[in-house]
A protein has these predicted regions:
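Acidic, low-complexity, intrinsically disordered interaction modules
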Residues: 24-151
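Charge-rich, intrinsically disordered N-terminal extensions
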Residues: 151, 155-159
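Short terminal alpha-helical segments
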Residues: 1-32, 97
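Short acidic DE-rich linear segments
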Residues: 162-165
Length: 165
């Protein structure tokens, strides 16, 4: 699932949580995202920024849900996941026994992993974190590195009803 499709399927509540986090904790990313969306629509960024959050956040979610916004949506998801959800990323990588930095970054992912191991790691996350947040993370993780494809992760995402968006 591409990043723009994740925004199409996530709840407005989670989208608002993401945008609020970026607005308060990752201001440069938030400003760049707004400017990118504004440029796509031939608008000035201030036009978007001046909308009250109750109007701005649904508008942003719809805009990130457009195919043309996929790279912007990917950047926003990565910033939110690495900023607000480092521990979840680290827990997933630990469960898979993958070496990573303190912030959850990985130098090299294995070519493939057994389905049982991925399913157990996903179940561990689902037991500890909000279901929709885990689903967004795993769908985004699957799409982040096009050089590494884990068919077992695809199967887990397709079979586990809690991971559907």
């Amino acid at each position: 699932m591409r990043s723009h499709e994740i925004f199409q399927r996530m709840s407005p509540t989670l989208a608002a949580e993401i945008f609020t986090f970026l607005q308060t904790e990752q201001k440069p990313v938030y400003k760049a995202a707004i400017q990118g969306l504004a440029n796509q629509r031939n608008l000035r960024g201030v036009f978007i920024e001046r909308k009250p959050p109750a109007e701005r956040f649904p508008w942003m979610q719809a805009a990130f849900g457009r195919k043309i916004s996929d790279s912007l949506a990917s950047h926003v998801l990565q910033s939110w996941l690495l900023g607000a959800n480092k521990q979840m990323l680290c827990d997933f990588l630990d469960a898979l026994e993958i070496q990573h930095g303190e912030d959850g970054t990985v130098d090299e992912l294995p070519a493939d992993l057994p389905k049982e191991k991925i399913a157990a790691a996903a179940d561990r996350l689902l037991g500890k974190y909000p279901t929709e947040t885990v689903a967004v993370y795993l769908h985004a993780f699957r799409d982040m590195d096009s050089t590494v494809q884990w068919p077992a992760l695809d199967e887990v995402l397709a079979e586990e009803p809690r991971l559907k968006l």
